[in-house]
Design a protein with these regions (language model features):
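Conserved NTP-donor binding/palm subdomain of two-metal-ion nucleotidyltransferases/polymerases, i.e.
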Residues: 2-128, 133-240
């Protein structure tokens, strides 16, 4: 039992060593990779929704360090599905942004396909739903939501907007804090900076269109606050 625990701990350390290489935080292939149990590495990557991220690094390994052919084919098959999912999410994000702008709302895609652009390969991130911030205030936004999709349950910072196969969450505010005083400060700051985020238009890869996404400076605070909140509620994985 002790040997298994040590082995798993060692594999976890190898995983994090290799992950740094996969996201190009380090340039050299980690020495520890030669001790990788690729079935264990695959299981960790799948659990953390990082299949595509690790494959990006695996493609750069010499043959003697790479997974066996059968596992590699399975890995590549899943990564190809992730690639296709990203294409759909890029296209859907463009549609959603366009539709809301047509309705007179300034908007900004939070996390999601905006975060995908921060990866070495924008198709390597496992996508989820579409989180979109709308300017205009909770009351005005809910009037529109209730007109288009009646009977949606409003939460403090967002409401579901089931208008396509891809799940959409419409945000009145990007984030919040639990402690009222801290949340007041955060909402004040968000009120000052969200105009800039809605104006930050970027081009998606391969001509899929344009969307508004947060600036890197904004994401430094926003993503960390999102992680902080999830640690105390739903839990959080490594994929962002």
């Amino acid at each position: 039992m002790i040997v298994k625990i040590i082995t798993m701990e060692a594999q976890q350390r190898i995983f994090f060593d290799f992950l740094k290489f996969c996201i190009e935080a380090v340039a050299e292939i980690p020495v520890s990779v030669k001790y990788a149990d690729w079935k264990v590495q695959y299981a960790i990557a799948k659990k953390q929704a990082l299949i595509g991220v690790l494959l990006h690094g695996i493609k750069q390994l010499p043959k003697e360090l790479a997974p066996d052919a059968d596992l590699l084919m399975t890995w590549m098959g899943l990564a190809q599905k992730i690639h296709q999912q990203n294409i759909r999410l890029f296209m859907d994000s463009v549609k959603v942004c366009h539709n809301f702008k047509q309705e007179g709302y300034r908007c900004c895609i939070l996390k999601g396909q905006g975060n995908a652009l921060l990866y070495p390969d924008p198709y390597m991130r496992t996508p989820g739903d579409i989180d979109i911030y709308l300017a205009g205030g909770r009351k005005r936004i809910m009037q529109y939501i209730n007109k288009v999709c009646p009977n949606q349950v409003m939460r403090y910072h967002h409401v579901d907007f089931p208008m396509m196969k891809t799940a959409i969450e419409v945000h009145f505010t990007p984030s919040y804090m639990f402690y009222p005083k801290h949340n007041h400060r955060m909402q004040k700051w968000l009120g000052e900076v969200m105009g800039l985020q809605c104006s930050n238009v970027v081009a998606l890869p391969d001509g899929y269109g344009e969307i508004s996404v947060p600036t890197v400076n904004f994401n430094v605070i926003y993503i960390l606050s999102h992680l902080y909140r999830h640690v105390f509620t739903e839990g959080i994985g490594l994929r962002q």
